[in-house]
Protein backbone atom coordinates (compact mmCIF):
# COMPACT_ATOMS: atom_id res chain seq x y z
CA UNK A 1 0.00 0.00 0.00
CA UNK A 2 1.44 3.36 -1.04
CA UNK A 3 1.21 6.64 0.85
CA UNK A 4 1.15 10.04 -0.83
CA UNK A 5 1.22 13.59 0.49
CA UNK A 6 -1.67 16.06 0.12
CA UNK A 7 0.51 18.05 -2.29
CA UNK A 8 1.14 15.03 -4.49
CA UNK A 9 -2.57 14.15 -4.50
CA UNK A 10 -3.43 17.72 -5.48
CA UNK A 11 -1.00 17.54 -8.40
CA UNK A 12 -2.41 14.15 -9.51
CA UNK A 13 -5.98 15.47 -9.41
CA UNK A 14 -5.05 18.63 -11.32
CA UNK A 15 -3.34 16.58 -14.02
CA UNK A 16 -6.33 14.27 -14.14
CA UNK A 17 -8.66 17.21 -14.68
CA UNK A 18 -6.49 18.38 -17.57
CA UNK A 19 -6.55 14.85 -19.00
CA UNK A 20 -10.33 14.68 -18.75
CA UNK A 21 -10.58 18.01 -20.58
CA UNK A 22 -8.12 16.83 -23.24
CA UNK A 23 -5.70 19.58 -22.29
CA UNK A 24 -2.70 17.39 -21.60
CA UNK A 25 -2.13 16.01 -18.11
CA UNK A 26 -2.54 12.32 -17.43
CA UNK A 27 -5.09 9.87 -16.08
CA UNK A 28 -4.86 9.59 -12.30
CA UNK A 29 -3.23 6.40 -11.07
CA UNK A 30 -4.10 5.97 -7.40
CA UNK A 31 -3.97 2.20 -7.41
CA UNK A 32 -2.99 0.64 -4.08
CA UNK A 33 -2.81 4.10 -2.46
CA UNK A 34 -3.89 4.74 1.13
CA UNK A 35 -6.33 7.63 0.74
CA UNK A 36 -7.99 7.46 4.14
CA UNK A 37 -6.63 10.79 5.39
CA UNK A 38 -7.25 12.74 2.19
CA UNK A 39 -10.17 14.92 1.14
CA UNK A 40 -11.89 13.85 -2.07
CA UNK A 41 -15.35 15.40 -1.63
CA UNK A 42 -16.74 16.63 -4.98
CA UNK A 43 -13.57 15.45 -6.77
CA UNK A 44 -13.81 14.30 -10.37
CA UNK A 45 -12.19 10.87 -10.43
CA UNK A 46 -14.02 9.56 -13.48
CA UNK A 47 -11.93 7.04 -15.43
CA UNK A 48 -9.23 7.12 -12.72
CA UNK A 49 -7.40 4.00 -11.56
CA UNK A 50 -8.13 3.31 -7.89
CA UNK A 51 -7.64 -0.41 -8.07
CA UNK A 52 -6.86 -1.81 -4.62
CA UNK A 53 -6.96 1.65 -3.02
CA UNK A 54 -7.71 2.01 0.69
CA UNK A 55 -10.78 4.24 0.96
CA UNK A 56 -12.11 3.11 4.31
CA UNK A 57 -14.30 5.66 6.11
CA UNK A 58 -13.45 8.31 3.50
CA UNK A 59 -15.98 10.96 2.49
CA UNK A 60 -16.76 10.59 -1.21
CA UNK A 61 -20.09 12.34 -0.97
CA UNK A 62 -21.22 13.57 -4.39
CA UNK A 63 -17.90 12.48 -5.94
CA UNK A 64 -17.69 11.67 -9.65
CA UNK A 65 -16.46 8.08 -9.95
CA UNK A 66 -17.96 7.40 -13.35
CA UNK A 67 -16.12 4.63 -15.23
CA UNK A 68 -13.59 4.49 -12.37
CA UNK A 69 -11.52 1.36 -11.76
CA UNK A 70 -12.27 0.35 -8.16
CA UNK A 71 -11.47 -3.34 -8.49
CA UNK A 72 -10.43 -4.79 -5.11
CA UNK A 73 -10.76 -1.35 -3.48
CA UNK A 74 -11.49 -1.18 0.25
CA UNK A 75 -14.50 1.12 0.69
CA UNK A 76 -15.74 -0.14 4.01
CA UNK A 77 -17.93 2.44 5.75
CA UNK A 78 -17.12 5.04 3.08
CA UNK A 79 -19.59 7.89 2.55
CA UNK A 80 -20.70 7.56 -1.07
CA UNK A 81 -24.05 9.29 -0.72
CA UNK A 82 -25.17 10.64 -4.10
CA UNK A 83 -21.85 9.57 -5.67
CA UNK A 84 -21.76 9.05 -9.42
CA UNK A 85 -20.59 5.46 -9.92
CA UNK A 86 -22.16 4.85 -13.31
CA UNK A 87 -20.26 2.18 -15.25
CA UNK A 88 -17.67 1.92 -12.44
CA UNK A 89 -15.76 -1.34 -12.04
CA UNK A 90 -16.20 -2.49 -8.44
CA UNK A 91 -15.44 -6.16 -8.87
CA UNK A 92 -14.37 -7.76 -5.60
CA UNK A 93 -14.53 -4.38 -3.88
CA UNK A 94 -15.32 -4.28 -0.16
CA UNK A 95 -18.22 -1.90 0.46
CA UNK A 96 -19.33 -3.36 3.76
CA UNK A 97 -21.28 -0.81 5.78
CA UNK A 98 -20.80 1.88 3.12
CA UNK A 99 -23.31 4.71 2.71
CA UNK A 100 -24.54 4.53 -0.88
CA UNK A 101 -27.84 6.32 -0.44
CA UNK A 102 -29.01 7.89 -3.70
CA UNK A 103 -25.78 6.76 -5.41
CA UNK A 104 -25.93 6.23 -9.16
CA UNK A 105 -24.59 2.75 -9.92
CA UNK A 106 -26.24 2.30 -13.28
CA UNK A 107 -24.51 -0.49 -15.23
CA UNK A 108 -21.76 -0.68 -12.62
CA UNK A 109 -19.83 -3.94 -12.30
CA UNK A 110 -20.22 -5.14 -8.71
CA UNK A 111 -19.51 -8.78 -9.37
CA UNK A 112 -18.45 -10.56 -6.16
CA UNK A 113 -18.43 -7.25 -4.26
CA UNK A 114 -18.96 -7.30 -0.48
CA UNK A 115 -21.91 -5.05 0.34
CA UNK A 116 -22.92 -6.52 3.66
CA UNK A 117 -24.93 -4.04 5.74
CA UNK A 118 -24.39 -1.33 3.13
CA UNK A 119 -27.05 1.38 2.80
CA UNK A 120 -28.21 1.39 -0.81
CA UNK A 121 -31.59 2.96 -0.18
CA UNK A 122 -32.80 4.99 -3.17
CA UNK A 123 -29.70 3.94 -5.14
CA UNK A 124 -29.90 3.51 -8.91
CA UNK A 125 -28.64 0.01 -9.76
CA UNK A 126 -30.37 -0.31 -13.09
CA UNK A 127 -28.67 -2.96 -15.26
CA UNK A 128 -25.83 -3.30 -12.74
CA UNK A 129 -23.92 -6.59 -12.52
CA UNK A 130 -24.22 -7.94 -8.97
CA UNK A 131 -23.56 -11.58 -9.75
CA UNK A 132 -22.17 -13.37 -6.73
CA UNK A 133 -22.18 -10.19 -4.63
CA UNK A 134 -22.85 -10.35 -0.89
CA UNK A 135 -25.69 -8.01 0.09
CA UNK A 136 -26.63 -9.74 3.31
CA UNK A 137 -28.50 -7.41 5.69
CA UNK A 138 -28.11 -4.51 3.26
CA UNK A 139 -30.72 -1.76 2.86
CA UNK A 140 -32.05 -1.65 -0.70
CA UNK A 141 -35.32 0.03 0.15
CA UNK A 142 -36.64 2.18 -2.71
CA UNK A 143 -33.67 1.14 -4.88
CA UNK A 144 -33.94 0.83 -8.66
CA UNK A 145 -32.93 -2.74 -9.53
CA UNK A 146 -34.61 -2.97 -12.92
CA UNK A 147 -32.78 -5.31 -15.29
CA UNK A 148 -30.11 -5.85 -12.62
CA UNK A 149 -28.23 -9.16 -12.64
CA UNK A 150 -28.65 -10.58 -9.14
CA UNK A 151 -27.96 -14.20 -10.02
CA UNK A 152 -26.21 -16.11 -7.24
CA UNK A 153 -26.33 -12.97 -5.08
CA UNK A 154 -26.74 -13.16 -1.31
CA UNK A 155 -29.70 -10.96 -0.33
CA UNK A 156 -30.62 -12.78 2.84
CA UNK A 157 -32.13 -10.51 5.49
CA UNK A 158 -31.89 -7.56 3.07
CA UNK A 159 -34.54 -4.85 3.03
CA UNK A 160 -36.09 -4.52 -0.42
CA UNK A 161 -39.10 -2.53 0.73
CA UNK A 162 -40.45 -0.48 -2.20
CA UNK A 163 -37.55 -1.67 -4.38
CA UNK A 164 -38.16 -2.03 -8.11
CA UNK A 165 -36.88 -5.40 -9.38
CA UNK A 166 -38.73 -5.35 -12.69
CA UNK A 167 -37.04 -7.81 -15.08
CA UNK A 168 -34.18 -8.37 -12.63
CA UNK A 169 -32.37 -11.71 -12.89
CA UNK A 170 -32.42 -13.26 -9.40
CA UNK A 171 -31.64 -16.76 -10.61
CA UNK A 172 -30.31 -18.84 -7.68
CA UNK A 173 -30.17 -15.77 -5.44
CA UNK A 174 -30.46 -16.09 -1.67
CA UNK A 175 -33.51 -14.10 -0.61
CA UNK A 176 -34.28 -15.93 2.60
CA UNK A 177 -35.73 -13.61 5.24
CA UNK A 178 -35.58 -10.67 2.80
CA UNK A 179 -38.24 -7.99 3.22
CA UNK A 180 -40.13 -7.58 -0.05
CA UNK A 181 -43.04 -5.50 1.21
CA UNK A 182 -44.30 -3.16 -1.53
CA UNK A 183 -41.52 -4.42 -3.85
CA UNK A 184 -42.10 -4.72 -7.60
CA UNK A 185 -41.08 -8.13 -8.94
CA UNK A 186 -42.84 -7.96 -12.28
CA UNK A 187 -40.92 -10.01 -14.82
CA UNK A 188 -38.12 -10.85 -12.38
CA UNK A 189 -36.44 -14.23 -12.72
CA UNK A 190 -36.69 -16.07 -9.40
CA UNK A 191 -35.88 -19.51 -10.73
CA UNK A 192 -33.84 -21.45 -8.19
CA UNK A 193 -33.91 -18.59 -5.70
CA UNK A 194 -34.07 -19.31 -1.96
CA UNK A 195 -37.29 -17.61 -0.86
CA UNK A 196 -37.64 -19.26 2.52
CA UNK A 197 -39.23 -16.99 5.14
CA UNK A 198 -39.37 -14.09 2.69
CA UNK A 199 -41.55 -11.20 3.89
CA UNK A 200 -44.24 -9.89 1.51
CA UNK A 201 -47.57 -8.10 1.74
CA UNK A 202 -50.57 -7.51 -0.50
CA UNK A 203 -48.70 -4.67 -2.20
CA UNK A 204 -45.79 -6.86 -3.31
CA UNK A 205 -46.22 -6.91 -7.09
CA UNK A 206 -45.39 -10.12 -8.94
CA UNK A 207 -44.86 -12.45 -5.99
CA UNK A 208 -48.36 -13.71 -5.34
CA UNK A 209 -50.11 -15.89 -7.92
CA UNK A 210 -51.65 -14.02 -10.85
CA UNK A 211 -54.49 -16.55 -10.94
CA UNK A 212 -56.83 -17.93 -8.25
CA UNK A 213 -55.09 -20.41 -5.99
CA UNK A 214 -58.21 -22.59 -5.62
CA UNK A 215 -61.36 -23.42 -7.52
CA UNK A 216 -62.28 -23.24 -11.18
CA UNK A 217 -62.05 -20.05 -13.21
CA UNK A 218 -61.88 -18.74 -16.77
CA UNK A 219 -58.59 -18.20 -18.58
CA UNK A 220 -57.65 -17.03 -22.06
CA UNK A 221 -54.84 -17.89 -24.45
CA UNK A 222 -53.89 -16.91 -27.98
CA UNK A 223 -53.43 -19.52 -30.72
CA UNK A 224 -53.36 -19.00 -34.49
CA UNK A 225 -54.76 -15.46 -34.15
CA UNK A 226 -57.66 -16.79 -32.09
CA UNK A 227 -58.59 -16.43 -28.45
CA UNK A 228 -59.20 -19.75 -26.74
CA UNK A 229 -61.50 -19.42 -23.73
CA UNK A 230 -60.57 -22.05 -21.15
CA UNK A 231 -62.17 -23.32 -17.99
CA UNK A 232 -59.34 -24.09 -15.61
CA UNK A 233 -60.79 -26.95 -13.59
CA UNK A 234 -61.14 -27.10 -9.83
CA UNK A 235 -58.46 -29.79 -9.57
CA UNK A 236 -56.14 -28.28 -12.19
CA UNK A 237 -52.60 -27.48 -11.13
CA UNK A 238 -51.93 -23.81 -11.74
CA UNK A 239 -49.07 -21.37 -11.32
CA UNK A 240 -47.54 -18.05 -12.33
CA UNK A 241 -44.06 -16.63 -11.88
CA UNK A 242 -43.64 -12.85 -11.61
CA UNK A 243 -45.74 -11.75 -14.57
CA UNK A 244 -49.43 -12.10 -15.45
CA UNK A 245 -48.73 -15.17 -17.60
CA UNK A 246 -49.99 -18.39 -15.98
CA UNK A 247 -49.71 -22.14 -16.57
CA UNK A 248 -51.96 -25.10 -15.77
CA UNK A 249 -51.87 -28.83 -16.39
CA UNK A 250 -55.40 -29.20 -17.78
CA UNK A 251 -58.40 -27.14 -18.88
CA UNK A 252 -61.68 -27.44 -20.75
CA UNK A 253 -62.03 -25.56 -24.04
CA UNK A 254 -65.18 -23.42 -23.93
CA UNK A 255 -64.92 -21.20 -27.01
CA UNK A 256 -62.50 -20.37 -29.82
CA UNK A 257 -62.96 -16.92 -31.38
CA UNK A 258 -61.02 -15.36 -34.26
CA UNK A 259 -59.58 -12.05 -33.05
CA UNK A 260 -60.10 -10.20 -36.35
CA UNK A 261 -63.49 -11.53 -37.51
CA UNK A 262 -65.10 -12.49 -34.16
CA UNK A 263 -66.16 -15.74 -35.85
CA UNK A 264 -66.31 -18.93 -33.81
CA UNK A 265 -64.18 -21.98 -34.59
CA UNK A 266 -64.40 -25.57 -33.41
CA UNK A 267 -60.67 -26.21 -33.11
CA UNK A 268 -57.27 -24.56 -33.34
CA UNK A 269 -53.69 -25.78 -33.13
CA UNK A 270 -51.14 -24.53 -30.64
CA UNK A 271 -48.63 -21.96 -31.92
CA UNK A 272 -45.81 -23.93 -30.27
CA UNK A 273 -46.83 -27.53 -30.96
CA UNK A 274 -48.93 -28.17 -34.05
CA UNK A 275 -49.84 -31.59 -32.70
CA UNK A 276 -51.50 -30.02 -29.66
CA UNK A 277 -55.08 -29.21 -30.67
CA UNK A 278 -57.71 -27.23 -28.74
CA UNK A 279 -61.24 -28.50 -29.53
CA UNK A 280 -64.40 -26.93 -28.15
CA UNK A 281 -65.96 -29.06 -25.43
CA UNK A 282 -62.85 -31.18 -24.86
CA UNK A 283 -60.39 -31.20 -21.97
CA UNK A 284 -56.76 -30.63 -22.92
CA UNK A 285 -54.02 -31.76 -20.58
CA UNK A 286 -50.24 -31.89 -20.15
CA UNK A 287 -48.53 -34.97 -18.70
CA UNK A 288 -45.16 -33.39 -17.89
CA UNK A 289 -46.39 -30.23 -16.14
CA UNK A 290 -43.51 -28.38 -14.41
CA UNK A 291 -44.39 -27.74 -10.75
CA UNK A 292 -41.69 -25.07 -10.37
CA UNK A 293 -43.77 -21.90 -10.50
CA UNK A 294 -40.73 -19.69 -11.13
CA UNK A 295 -39.92 -21.54 -14.37
CA UNK A 296 -42.38 -19.40 -16.26
CA UNK A 297 -41.81 -20.65 -19.80
CA UNK A 298 -41.76 -24.34 -18.91
CA UNK A 299 -44.26 -27.08 -19.76
CA UNK A 300 -47.94 -26.46 -19.24
CA UNK A 301 -50.95 -24.83 -20.85
CA UNK A 302 -50.12 -21.13 -20.85
CA UNK A 303 -52.94 -18.65 -20.35
CA UNK A 304 -53.93 -15.27 -18.93
CA UNK A 305 -56.72 -14.39 -16.54
CA UNK A 306 -57.37 -11.21 -18.53
CA UNK A 307 -58.69 -11.61 -22.07
CA UNK A 308 -56.97 -8.40 -23.12
CA UNK A 309 -53.61 -9.68 -21.88
CA UNK A 310 -54.07 -12.74 -24.09
CA UNK A 311 -54.94 -10.56 -27.10
CA UNK A 312 -51.89 -8.36 -26.51
CA UNK A 313 -49.50 -11.28 -26.06
CA UNK A 314 -46.92 -11.74 -28.81
Tell where the protein language model's regions lie, with residue ranges.
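Intrinsic low-complexity/IDR segments
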Residues: 1-82, 86-87, 91-92, 96-102, ...
Amino acid sequence: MRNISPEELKRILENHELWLNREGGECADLSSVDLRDHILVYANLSYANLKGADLRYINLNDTNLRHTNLIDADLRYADLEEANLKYADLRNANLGGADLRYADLKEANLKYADLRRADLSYANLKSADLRGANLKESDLSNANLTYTDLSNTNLSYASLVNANLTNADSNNAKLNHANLKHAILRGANLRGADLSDVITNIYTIGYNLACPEKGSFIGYKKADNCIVELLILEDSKRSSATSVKCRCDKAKVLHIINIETDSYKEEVRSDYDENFVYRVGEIVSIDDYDNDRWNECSTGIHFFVSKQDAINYK
